[in-house]
UniProtKB/Swiss-Prot annotation:
PANTHER family: 30S RIBOSOMAL PROTEIN S20, SMALL RIBOSOMAL SUBUNIT PROTEIN BS20C. Keywords: Ribonucleoprotein, Ribosomal protein, RNA-binding, rRNA-binding. The keyword Cytoplasm does not apply. It comes from the Bacteria. The lineage of its organism: Bacteria, Pseudomonadati, Pseudomonadota, Alphaproteobacteria, Hyphomicrobiales. This is Small ribosomal subunit protein bS20.
Length: 92
């Protein structure tokens, strides 16, 4: 239990930031899941649109410190490769 006034304030701030970060992380997961569902359905256009929406969300999460920048880059890279493979197989 926090005893000093500053420790109590820090606890309140941590709780607020935790809620904000949870919301951001959840939003990122939702966007990534939409891309993965579009890939699974085999719809290249829908997958590309979902990927283009997810990319800035991942970058925003990385810039805000919710995700490490390497983690966000890795997710973007892997999703891009899967979307590209889907569009190549759709045109072939």
């Amino acid at each position: 239990m926090a005893n000093t006034t500053s420790a109590k304030k820090a606890t309140r701030k941590i709780a607020r930031r935790t809620d904000v970060n949870k919301a951001r992380r959840s939003r990122v997961r939702t966007f990534v899941r939409q891309v993965e569902e579009a890939i699974a359905s085999g719809d290249a256009d829908k997958a590309k649109a979902a990927f283009l929406a997810a990319q800035p969300e991942l970058a925003r999460a990385a810039s805000k410190g919710v995700l490490h920048s390497n983690t966000a880059s890795r997710k973007v890279s892997r999703l891009a490769a899967r979307v590209k493979a889907l569009s190549v197989s759709a045109t072939a």
